[in-house]
């Protein structure tokens, strides 16, 4: 870049010398050019820095000789300081070169007047600034800066710092060089016409400097700008602080929520016993290198005459259908309590702690209505006589193309069930599995429910391990079941956020769902009427009416339900309607 700039400065000074000679020629009284010796007046020395003597003319004084000053080397640090000073928005314009030199000079790196003047001329040629200095003024008068293009100066400052954009700057300088050459050619042509055939001469263009390789490392200026842009403003910090305070308020539990949680908290302590990780007492003592097993619950191996211990544990354990002949190892709970174990009596749950106690004097939530049930075929029962319910739960016998120990319902029979009459506002819990998951969603929409949640039951075996050899599943063994949760209308008075949507429980008999689901539903809607469809004897629960064809007769206690049932079925027999 410096070689190109030097060439431009040399051309500009040659132009100034030629223009000065033309001005002096015009001021002569004769106003005519000496054609006998035109080279003495018009031929500038483009190739030499030494002054060229001119021959005397007959009608005027000798023109003064002009020499081209040697080009100063450009100081990168001085150029950077000058760019930074000129790009300052607080700089008052116009200002002269002397004031600029004093402003950017430091004791460690003083700036010279010639260097500042040269850089100002360079910036003016690059159209970064505008300077005011007449062609005929003396060199003693400093250059006056009248205008500064701050956007271009900022861009140039970044280019100098990063040493990027070298090609763009070189292109701009090359354009200035071409314009200077065009001006020089025009003046030379005019002088040749006045000299009646004077041979025109032009300087050879300077060679283009080779392009330097661009460096991709980020400069300190870019890093500082990026850090400033990444910093949050005061307004953003205040807004973030307010948002955090609002979030903390929203996440804080209210007094009502705390009261509800306390209402359903286990009294005294949880009435459960934890299983030992090592299974049997022998493995527990071996692992802990102790004389006695831990106080957790253990298992005992069942070793029969036909048992082959080398085969390992049975995959189905206590759910095995052929335990009388199965050769694999089975287990049972080792309920024997070591009375000599220290602290064993302290950890035995007392009967007093297991009693239900009311909280806050309000016993309405703790009041449970005795269980009720009706043995019937749900397809033919007029369920409208049972009234309205807050929660409906169903475990339908889906036709999943598998041999089951009970009868199944077809898809059309499931769709025709009169479920909508049981509720105006409330929740429906629908157990689905396999291909029935899509059919269950279809039935929810058909019955007027919107699916809002889905409970997952992760099945564990007797040893509290994940099931890997389930009896269901075609491509993969199923180790879980799904319970779709649908909502109808606008239910009020339900508790939100008390339980999660995952149940981890042991597998029992076929289609025997975990008892934890009843606790979840009771905490969701305490003290309300609930009904379960397709239930069995183990499903009867307080506050629930259970319907199914495997129950023991009819057991109704609600006076209103009893009256409507006797009116609809006087003989107590629920038979298939004649129109079906």
UniProtKB/Swiss-Prot annotation:
Keywords: Acetylation, Biological rhythms, Cytoplasm, Differentiation, DNA damage, Immunity, Innate immunity, Isopeptide bond, Methyltransferase, Nucleus, Oogenesis, Phosphoprotein, RNA-binding, S-adenosyl-L-methionine, Spermatogenesis, Transferase, Ubl conjugation. Residues 507-515 are annotated as: Gate loop 2. PROSITE patterns: MT_A70, SAM_MTA70L_1. It catalyses: an adenosine in mRNA + S-adenosyl-L-methionine = an N(6)-methyladenosine in mRNA + S-adenosyl-L-homocysteine + H(+). A motif (Nuclear localization signal) lies at residues 210-215. Residues 396-410 are annotated as: Gate loop 1. This is N(6)-adenosine-methyltransferase catalytic subunit METTL3. It comes from Mus musculus (Mouse).
